[in-house]
Amino acid sequence: MKVRTLTAIIALIVFLPILLKGGLVLMIFANILALIALKELLNMNMIKFVSVPGLISAVGLIIIMLPQHAGPWVQVIQLKSLIAMSFIVLSYTVLSKNRFSFMDAAFCLMSVAYVGIGFMFFYETRSEGLHYILYAFLIVWLTDTGAYLFGKMMGKHKLWPVISPNKTIEGFIGGLFCSLIVPLAMLYFVDFNMNVWILLGVTLILSLFGQLGDLVESGFKRHFGVKDSGRILPGHGGILDRFDSFMFVLPLLNILLIQS
């Protein structure tokens, strides 16, 4: 517990100023986190980060995470790069004489999209305003807290025991309920320019998909037989273990709230 608490304090001291600063500093930080998360995901499938498919995936990830506001050329480069990456990793299945399989190639492409889109929207959301990223973080944290407390006090029915044995239906519902505190509290300080009932609905959707994001990452770990995605955060696991919910929450927040 001491190690876990110390790690959380150090992470907060490093993370909070970068989040408040935003801009280029946050973009670089998000890219570093994304590369670590990609390495964790590839390692689950026994794909070395320093290898042909690993390095191609890393390049694809960096391109996916180019800032969208830089201009229309960004999306053109992203599309062409993903096409090129697909051809390269598929060709490598032949060049490696099937030591690198078609399933591995598909996994690399999926990993780049999964990690890249999630972390790209990390700094894109912050660029729209500090209140949006705080809104996302508070939803995830209160959902997790509510799910834990309700599950501890009332949990009797397992949610998905094959993937995550400790999660319960009661905890899942409790997490949704607790997430509603966020918009009700933030509306006193921030004008979201949205009807309160619509904002509550968006919050429930984000809370729901945040919990699904957690289950997806748990599914990865269960499938590949690992306890944590990594060991970079003592007591907490890896980067993916800490940001799994945000892989779903941040893109959806942009679609439902910012770009609507």
From Swiss-Prot:
Give the top-level enzyme category: transferase
User: Which catalysed reactions does the entry list for this protein?
Assistant: a 1,2-diacyl-sn-glycero-3-phosphate + CTP + H(+) = a CDP-1,2-diacyl-sn-glycerol + diphosphate
Report the EC number(s), separated by commas if there are several: 2.7.7.41
Q: What is its main location?
A: membrane
Pfam families (UniProt xref): CTP_transf_1
**Where found in the cell?**
Cell membrane
A single Gene Ontology CC term: plasma membrane
Per its record, what are the GO molecular function terms? Answer: phosphatidate cytidylyltransferase activity
Q: Which UniProt keywords apply?
A: Cell membrane, Lipid biosynthesis, Lipid metabolism, Membrane, Nucleotidyltransferase, Phospholipid biosynthesis, Phospholipid metabolism, Transferase, Transmembrane, Transmembrane helix
Q: In which pathway does it act?
A: Phospholipid metabolism; CDP-diacylglycerol biosynthesis; CDP-diacylglycerol from sn-glycerol 3-phosphate: step 3/3
What's any GO biological process attached to this entry?
Answer: CDP-diacylglycerol biosynthetic process
Report how it sits in the membrane. Answer: Multi-pass membrane protein
For this protein, the parts annotated as crossing the membrane are 9-29, 46-66, 70-90, 102-122, 130-150, 172-192, 196-216
InterPro entries tied to this protein: PC_trans
Identify the domain of life: Bacteria
Q: Which family does it belong to?
A: Belongs to the CDS family.
**What is the protein's name according to its record?**
Phosphatidate cytidylyltransferase
Q: Which species is this record about? A: Staphylococcus aureus (strain COL)
